[in-house]
Amino acid sequence: TTLVALPAGAGLSVLAGPILHLLYPAVPETAEAAAYHLTFLGLACIFVCLMVATNGVLQAYGKEYIPVFTLLCGGVLKIVTNYLMVGDPATNVRGAPVSTLYCYVLIVVLNLIAIARCVPERPAYLHLFAKPLLITAVMALAARSSYGVLVRCLPERWAVLPAILIAVVVYGVLALALGAVTRADVIGLPKGEKIAEILHLR
């Protein structure tokens, strides 16, 4: 989940403006206004994916009530922060995506704490998240930097496509070079055995 959710969410976040300008060229002002929201909602997507994965782990170990409790906690935080931020003239509607991000971050943190306490095989979170986070940070930097260079020689709305391609290549190369992708990760994909052999995964 982290190998897919992290780059997808980070990519949406760092290239929010360019992506929206590409999709909605006829309304640049609206696209620019929405970019702020997508910056936070892109990050929220990461935690939505992690929430689903951690909920599944807890349910598999017979702790079905914990995801319900953590979801309620996240919902309460969302309501409170939404009320405070959207009601503040300084932030107004811009507070909505921020409160959404807070909501899912809290849910995931509580789920991870519950997994560490309830699952017999204590998960090594540092080992699980360190490499994907490092690779994603480099990928996000590559995406933003390459867009900044490309936009000087290409129309703004088209510079985002090669920037995304560069980010995908950077992420893929680093994931393989640092061993973040294993044979077990690939084997479940269609033609996974063949892909694993081509990539020399063990």
Predicted regions and their residues:
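Membrane-embedded alpha-helical segments of multi-pass transporters/permeases
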Residues: 9-17, 22, 40, 79, ...
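Residue-level hotspots within the lipid-embedded alpha helices of multi-pass solute transporters
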Residues: 5-10, 41-49, 71-75, 101-105, ...
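Membrane-interface junctions at transmembrane-helix termini in multi-pass inner-membrane proteins
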Residues: 39, 43-73, 83-84
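Membrane-proximal transmembrane or re-entrant/amphipathic helices at the cytosolic face
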Residues: 144-202
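Membrane-interface helix-loop junctions in multi-pass transport and translocation proteins
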Residues: 65, 72-113, 123, 141, ...
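Interfacial segments at transmembrane-helix termini and the short loops linking adjacent helices
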Residues: 12-45, 90, 94
